[in-house]
Amino acid sequence: MRKLVFILIAYCLPLVVNAQEADMRISELINTSNWFALEKEYPLLKDSIQYDFVGLMAEAMIAQNFNKEKEAIGMFRTLINSHQQQIGSGAALSFAEMALGNYERCGMYRLAADKANGLIDQIKTSGAPIDYPKLLDIHKRNKALSKYDSTIVIHRNTKDVIVPFTMNNSDVLFDKQTPVSNRYYIPVTIHGVAYQFMFDTGATTTYLSKRLADRIGVEYIDYSSPYGSLAYLDSMQLGDVTFKNVIALVHNGTPLDSICNIDAVLGMDLVRQLDELRIDNKNNQITLPVKKSKKPECGRNLRCTNQFLFVDVMDEKGSLVALLDSGAETGFTYNYFLKHQSEFGQLRGTKEIVTGNVDGFQSTMAIHVPSVNMSICGHELNMKDVYVPYMKAKNENNDIVLGIDFFRKYNYVTLNFKDMFIVCE
């Protein structure tokens, strides 16, 4: 997404110099990746937009970031085919890559492979000085996946599905290892046997350790990445909900596997296909309700970008990029420090903290902050005695991670993936 931002700045600025104020505002929101503001302001400004392609870009990016990726495909296609002169070839390529990702996430693997291959041929024929390793990888992966059907969710939706959870992983396959506690673990049934899966809103894909994958007999796919190999599962069950044709990542044994001893993760690739779930921290259960919740007055306050979940969080400095990650602890990043650096000048007390994700673990130095205030959907959230890193760590694009301790602050947390909102009670 960041690549697209700079391309749009370069190609759209000459056009919006003479554009109306609405066009300039929409372009600004797209160029700054301010998707929550774009979603709220676009309906108010759409009738004042002068250039059709600006409105179409807004609608495409709203669909892209609010779990309507199949709808976004057609909009990207129109932008590429009908508005390439206005948006430029660079932006068109970025939109094409997004569309390919959407084809894949929607299970249209053969179409994704064919279109990626066609785009590669076009670039070669044009002689344009464009590198396309991402396109080659998309083609290779989807060609390998093309023999499989798309993932489907079978949910009769006649009664609430209630799934119990525990905060400790009791299904440890390796002796002399300590399981990760203080996370949501739910029973997922594969071939008649229940296994403990971590419910992880910070995981973009469903994950299996190799030891568990070999135990259940997955079908390995002829594709691997730095993180591991892809594998096929014919089905798995979460209560009365069945996921068929599941593509999982079998991890290659980085510290996430060997240190944390996590054998299975239910990731956002499957979770976001559920219309709604309600985490009940009082009764230790997750409910998939038949009757869905009403959208809160504040509207959409949850977005899904590249299968990462983000919450609409504000503080006195403005909007914060807040990753919602039930598989991690709540924490801040160096980006947050930069936004609030002037406030931290007189603070004392530092310590080394360790952060980690699928890339592994890293340590950084952080400053002690007695209290941090922010708001979600108009509700105040106060965090005390937090540590904010003052040294940059790799692969950080967010300001804050709202982790498991955020979830556990509330009796109930509702996540609605149809209308894209979170409600905390």
Regions found by a protein language model. Give the residues of each.
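Bacterial Sec-dependent N-terminal signal peptides
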Residues: 1-26
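Pepsin/retropepsin-fold aspartyl endopeptidases
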Residues: 20-425
